[in-house]
Protein backbone atom coordinates (compact mmCIF):
# COMPACT_ATOMS: atom_id res chain seq x y z
CA UNK A 1 0.00 0.00 0.00
CA UNK A 2 2.92 2.38 0.63
CA UNK A 3 3.74 2.49 -3.11
CA UNK A 4 0.20 3.62 -3.90
CA UNK A 5 0.35 6.28 -1.17
CA UNK A 6 3.67 7.62 -2.50
CA UNK A 7 2.24 7.67 -6.04
CA UNK A 8 -0.75 9.71 -4.83
CA UNK A 9 1.50 12.17 -2.95
CA UNK A 10 3.73 12.67 -6.01
CA UNK A 11 0.74 13.11 -8.31
CA UNK A 12 -0.79 15.78 -6.08
CA UNK A 13 2.62 17.47 -5.84
CA UNK A 14 2.69 17.57 -9.66
CA UNK A 15 -0.74 19.23 -9.69
CA UNK A 16 0.35 21.80 -7.10
CA UNK A 17 3.51 22.57 -9.08
CA UNK A 18 1.53 23.05 -12.30
CA UNK A 19 -0.87 25.39 -10.51
CA UNK A 20 2.00 27.44 -9.08
CA UNK A 21 3.77 27.40 -12.45
CA UNK A 22 0.91 29.23 -14.14
CA UNK A 23 1.27 32.06 -11.62
CA UNK A 24 5.07 32.19 -12.01
CA UNK A 25 4.95 32.64 -15.80
CA UNK A 26 6.34 29.16 -16.42
CA UNK A 27 5.27 27.95 -19.86
CA UNK A 28 3.70 24.57 -19.16
CA UNK A 29 4.43 23.10 -22.60
CA UNK A 30 8.15 23.80 -22.23
CA UNK A 31 8.16 22.45 -18.68
CA UNK A 32 6.52 19.23 -19.88
CA UNK A 33 9.21 18.80 -22.54
CA UNK A 34 12.07 19.13 -20.04
CA UNK A 35 10.13 16.98 -17.58
CA UNK A 36 10.77 14.10 -19.99
CA UNK A 37 14.51 14.85 -20.08
CA UNK A 38 14.60 14.51 -16.29
CA UNK A 39 12.52 11.33 -16.43
CA UNK A 40 14.89 9.84 -19.03
CA UNK A 41 17.89 10.65 -16.82
CA UNK A 42 16.34 9.12 -13.70
CA UNK A 43 15.20 6.05 -15.65
CA UNK A 44 18.71 5.44 -16.95
CA UNK A 45 20.72 6.01 -13.76
CA UNK A 46 18.26 4.74 -11.12
CA UNK A 47 16.48 1.91 -12.91
CA UNK A 48 19.46 0.85 -15.07
CA UNK A 49 17.47 -0.50 -18.05
CA UNK A 50 18.77 -3.70 -19.61
CA UNK A 51 18.76 -3.62 -23.41
CA UNK A 52 20.00 -7.22 -23.65
CA UNK A 53 23.21 -6.10 -25.37
CA UNK A 54 21.25 -4.66 -28.31
CA UNK A 55 21.47 -1.23 -29.88
CA UNK A 56 18.69 1.15 -28.88
CA UNK A 57 16.84 0.88 -32.22
CA UNK A 58 17.33 -2.90 -32.39
CA UNK A 59 15.84 -3.31 -28.93
CA UNK A 60 12.80 -1.27 -29.96
CA UNK A 61 12.36 -3.40 -33.08
CA UNK A 62 12.77 -6.75 -31.31
CA UNK A 63 11.17 -6.20 -27.89
CA UNK A 64 7.79 -7.81 -27.24
CA UNK A 65 6.91 -4.62 -25.33
CA UNK A 66 7.32 -2.43 -28.42
CA UNK A 67 3.57 -1.74 -28.79
CA UNK A 68 3.46 -0.56 -25.16
CA UNK A 69 6.31 1.94 -25.24
CA UNK A 70 5.39 3.16 -28.72
CA UNK A 71 1.84 3.82 -27.54
CA UNK A 72 3.03 5.51 -24.33
CA UNK A 73 5.63 7.55 -26.20
CA UNK A 74 2.91 8.95 -28.42
CA UNK A 75 0.09 9.21 -25.88
CA UNK A 76 1.92 10.83 -22.94
CA UNK A 77 2.64 14.13 -24.76
CA UNK A 78 -0.43 13.95 -27.02
CA UNK A 79 -2.87 13.69 -24.12
CA UNK A 80 -1.24 16.73 -22.51
CA UNK A 81 -1.77 18.72 -25.72
CA UNK A 82 -5.36 17.45 -25.99
CA UNK A 83 -5.96 18.38 -22.34
CA UNK A 84 -4.78 21.95 -22.99
CA UNK A 85 -7.20 22.21 -25.94
CA UNK A 86 -10.04 20.74 -23.88
CA UNK A 87 -9.43 23.35 -21.17
CA UNK A 88 -9.44 26.06 -23.85
CA UNK A 89 -12.71 24.98 -25.52
CA UNK A 90 -14.62 23.25 -22.69
CA UNK A 91 -13.23 24.74 -19.47
CA UNK A 92 -11.04 23.36 -16.71
CA UNK A 93 -13.91 21.93 -14.60
CA UNK A 94 -15.27 19.79 -17.44
CA UNK A 95 -11.77 18.77 -18.55
CA UNK A 96 -10.81 17.69 -15.04
CA UNK A 97 -14.05 15.72 -14.78
CA UNK A 98 -13.31 13.96 -18.08
CA UNK A 99 -9.84 13.01 -16.83
CA UNK A 100 -11.15 11.59 -13.55
CA UNK A 101 -14.08 9.75 -15.14
CA UNK A 102 -11.61 7.99 -17.44
CA UNK A 103 -11.38 5.62 -14.45
CA UNK A 104 -14.23 3.73 -16.14
CA UNK A 105 -11.88 2.37 -18.85
CA UNK A 106 -9.18 0.82 -16.62
CA UNK A 107 -11.85 -0.57 -14.26
CA UNK A 108 -13.45 -2.25 -17.28
CA UNK A 109 -10.03 -3.49 -18.40
CA UNK A 110 -9.32 -4.94 -14.95
CA UNK A 111 -12.06 -7.50 -15.47
CA UNK A 112 -12.07 -7.94 -19.27
CA UNK A 113 -8.32 -7.79 -20.04
CA UNK A 114 -6.55 -8.57 -16.76
CA UNK A 115 -9.17 -11.16 -15.69
CA UNK A 116 -9.60 -9.88 -12.15
CA UNK A 117 -12.18 -11.82 -10.16
CA UNK A 118 -15.39 -9.84 -9.73
CA UNK A 119 -16.47 -10.10 -6.10
CA UNK A 120 -19.30 -8.46 -4.17
CA UNK A 121 -16.86 -6.23 -2.27
CA UNK A 122 -15.32 -4.97 -5.51
CA UNK A 123 -18.71 -4.16 -6.98
CA UNK A 124 -19.56 -2.19 -3.82
CA UNK A 125 -16.14 -0.49 -3.89
CA UNK A 126 -16.42 0.54 -7.54
CA UNK A 127 -19.95 1.91 -7.07
CA UNK A 128 -18.82 3.91 -4.02
CA UNK A 129 -15.79 5.16 -5.98
CA UNK A 130 -17.93 6.58 -8.79
CA UNK A 131 -20.41 8.12 -6.33
CA UNK A 132 -17.44 9.71 -4.57
CA UNK A 133 -16.05 11.01 -7.85
CA UNK A 134 -19.43 12.52 -8.76
CA UNK A 135 -19.61 14.33 -5.41
CA UNK A 136 -16.00 15.54 -5.61
CA UNK A 137 -16.29 16.73 -9.21
CA UNK A 138 -19.57 18.59 -8.71
CA UNK A 139 -18.56 22.23 -8.60
CA UNK A 140 -20.21 25.52 -9.52
CA UNK A 141 -20.14 26.10 -13.29
CA UNK A 142 -21.54 29.63 -13.43
CA UNK A 143 -20.22 31.58 -16.36
CA UNK A 144 -19.33 28.51 -18.40
CA UNK A 145 -20.75 28.55 -21.92
CA UNK A 146 -22.13 25.55 -23.78
CA UNK A 147 -19.49 23.18 -25.12
CA UNK A 148 -18.92 23.42 -28.89
CA UNK A 149 -17.85 20.56 -31.18
CA UNK A 150 -14.13 21.16 -30.56
CA UNK A 151 -14.78 21.07 -26.82
CA UNK A 152 -16.66 17.78 -27.09
CA UNK A 153 -13.83 16.23 -29.12
CA UNK A 154 -11.30 17.49 -26.57
CA UNK A 155 -13.24 16.00 -23.64
CA UNK A 156 -13.57 12.64 -25.42
CA UNK A 157 -9.83 12.73 -26.17
CA UNK A 158 -9.01 13.44 -22.51
CA UNK A 159 -11.35 10.69 -21.27
CA UNK A 160 -10.07 8.10 -23.72
CA UNK A 161 -6.38 9.11 -23.55
CA UNK A 162 -5.99 9.06 -19.77
CA UNK A 163 -7.93 5.80 -19.53
CA UNK A 164 -5.68 4.07 -22.08
CA UNK A 165 -2.52 5.40 -20.39
CA UNK A 166 -3.63 3.86 -17.07
CA UNK A 167 -4.16 0.52 -18.81
CA UNK A 168 -0.75 0.75 -20.50
CA UNK A 169 0.99 1.41 -17.16
CA UNK A 170 -0.62 -1.77 -15.82
CA UNK A 171 0.84 -3.59 -18.85
CA UNK A 172 4.25 -2.06 -18.05
CA UNK A 173 3.94 -3.41 -14.50
CA UNK A 174 3.23 -6.88 -15.90
CA UNK A 175 6.49 -6.80 -17.90
CA UNK A 176 8.39 -7.42 -14.64
CA UNK A 177 12.13 -6.84 -14.95
CA UNK A 178 11.72 -5.33 -18.41
CA UNK A 179 9.81 -2.29 -17.14
CA UNK A 180 12.91 -0.02 -16.69
CA UNK A 181 13.73 -0.32 -20.40
CA UNK A 182 10.08 0.19 -21.31
CA UNK A 183 9.89 3.38 -19.22
CA UNK A 184 13.19 4.70 -20.56
CA UNK A 185 12.12 4.23 -24.18
CA UNK A 186 8.61 5.59 -23.53
CA UNK A 187 10.02 8.78 -21.99
CA UNK A 188 12.55 9.11 -24.83
CA UNK A 189 9.85 8.86 -27.49
CA UNK A 190 7.59 11.24 -25.55
CA UNK A 191 10.43 13.79 -25.37
CA UNK A 192 10.96 13.55 -29.13
CA UNK A 193 7.25 14.10 -29.82
CA UNK A 194 7.04 17.07 -27.43
CA UNK A 195 10.19 18.80 -28.65
CA UNK A 196 9.15 18.37 -32.31
CA UNK A 197 5.77 19.90 -31.44
CA UNK A 198 7.41 22.88 -29.72
CA UNK A 199 9.98 23.43 -32.45
CA UNK A 200 7.21 23.45 -35.06
CA UNK A 201 5.48 26.12 -32.95
CA UNK A 202 8.77 28.06 -32.87
CA UNK A 203 8.46 28.83 -29.18
CA UNK A 204 10.73 31.21 -27.29
CA UNK A 205 12.40 29.12 -24.59
CA UNK A 206 12.60 30.52 -21.06
CA UNK A 207 14.97 29.50 -18.26
CA UNK A 208 12.17 29.44 -15.67
CA UNK A 209 10.27 26.90 -17.78
CA UNK A 210 13.36 24.70 -18.06
CA UNK A 211 13.93 24.77 -14.28
CA UNK A 212 10.24 24.15 -13.64
CA UNK A 213 10.38 21.22 -16.06
CA UNK A 214 13.31 19.65 -14.22
CA UNK A 215 11.45 19.80 -10.89
CA UNK A 216 8.29 18.54 -12.57
CA UNK A 217 10.26 15.65 -14.07
CA UNK A 218 11.47 14.48 -10.66
CA UNK A 219 7.94 14.41 -9.24
CA UNK A 220 6.41 12.90 -12.37
CA UNK A 221 9.05 10.17 -12.60
CA UNK A 222 8.46 8.99 -9.03
CA UNK A 223 4.70 9.31 -9.51
CA UNK A 224 4.85 6.86 -12.43
CA UNK A 225 7.45 4.62 -10.77
CA UNK A 226 5.45 4.19 -7.56
CA UNK A 227 2.24 3.72 -9.56
CA UNK A 228 3.80 0.85 -11.51
CA UNK A 229 5.24 -0.67 -8.33
CA UNK A 230 1.77 -0.44 -6.74
CA UNK A 231 0.40 -2.45 -9.65
CA UNK A 232 3.17 -5.00 -9.13
CA UNK A 233 2.40 -5.19 -5.40
CA UNK A 234 -1.31 -5.73 -6.08
CA UNK A 235 -0.92 -7.75 -9.27
CA UNK A 236 -4.19 -9.59 -8.69
CA UNK A 237 -6.18 -6.50 -7.68
CA UNK A 238 -5.76 -3.82 -10.38
CA UNK A 239 -9.13 -2.31 -9.46
CA UNK A 240 -7.72 -1.25 -6.08
CA UNK A 241 -4.79 0.53 -7.75
CA UNK A 242 -6.83 2.13 -10.55
CA UNK A 243 -9.57 3.37 -8.22
CA UNK A 244 -7.29 4.08 -5.25
CA UNK A 245 -4.95 6.21 -7.33
CA UNK A 246 -7.72 8.17 -9.00
CA UNK A 247 -9.89 8.93 -6.00
CA UNK A 248 -6.86 9.26 -3.71
CA UNK A 249 -5.46 12.02 -5.92
CA UNK A 250 -8.70 13.94 -6.14
CA UNK A 251 -9.42 13.61 -2.38
CA UNK A 252 -5.95 14.78 -1.36
CA UNK A 253 -6.00 17.38 -4.14
CA UNK A 254 -9.30 18.77 -2.87
CA UNK A 255 -7.99 19.05 0.70
CA UNK A 256 -4.68 20.54 -0.51
CA UNK A 257 -6.57 23.08 -2.59
CA UNK A 258 -8.50 24.17 0.50
CA UNK A 259 -5.45 24.36 2.78
CA UNK A 260 -2.91 25.86 0.34
CA UNK A 261 -4.98 27.79 -2.21
CA UNK A 262 -7.98 28.59 0.02
CA UNK A 263 -10.38 26.83 -2.35
CA UNK A 264 -13.85 26.17 -0.98
CA UNK A 265 -14.93 22.60 -0.19
CA UNK A 266 -18.71 22.17 -0.31
CA UNK A 267 -20.70 19.74 1.83
CA UNK A 268 -21.14 17.58 -1.27
CA UNK A 269 -17.36 17.51 -1.77
CA UNK A 270 -16.86 16.37 1.84
CA UNK A 271 -19.47 13.67 1.24
CA UNK A 272 -17.46 12.64 -1.82
CA UNK A 273 -14.33 12.24 0.30
CA UNK A 274 -16.25 9.98 2.72
CA UNK A 275 -17.60 7.86 -0.16
CA UNK A 276 -14.12 7.66 -1.71
CA UNK A 277 -12.45 6.52 1.51
CA UNK A 278 -15.23 3.97 1.96
CA UNK A 279 -14.54 2.71 -1.57
CA UNK A 280 -10.84 2.16 -0.83
CA UNK A 281 -11.77 0.39 2.42
CA UNK A 282 -14.11 -1.96 0.54
CA UNK A 283 -11.60 -2.69 -2.23
CA UNK A 284 -8.75 -3.40 0.19
CA UNK A 285 -10.30 -4.76 3.40
CA UNK A 286 -13.83 -6.03 2.81
CA UNK A 287 -12.85 -9.35 1.22
CA UNK A 288 -10.45 -10.00 4.12
CA UNK A 289 -13.12 -9.18 6.70
CA UNK A 290 -15.69 -11.43 5.00
CA UNK A 291 -13.13 -14.24 4.76
UniProtKB/Swiss-Prot annotation:
The keyword Cell membrane applies. It comes from the Bacteria. GO terms for cellular component: membrane; plasma membrane. Disulfide bonds: none annotated. Its main location: membrane. Residues 107-138 form the EamA domain. Keywords: Cell membrane, Membrane, Transmembrane, Transmembrane helix. The chain crosses the membrane at residues 1-21, 26-46, 67-87, 95-115, 117-137, 149-169, 179-199, 208-228, 241-261, 270-290. It is found in: Cell membrane. It is a multi-pass membrane protein. SUPFAM superfamilies: Multidrug resistance efflux transporter EmrE. This is Uncharacterized protein HI_1376.
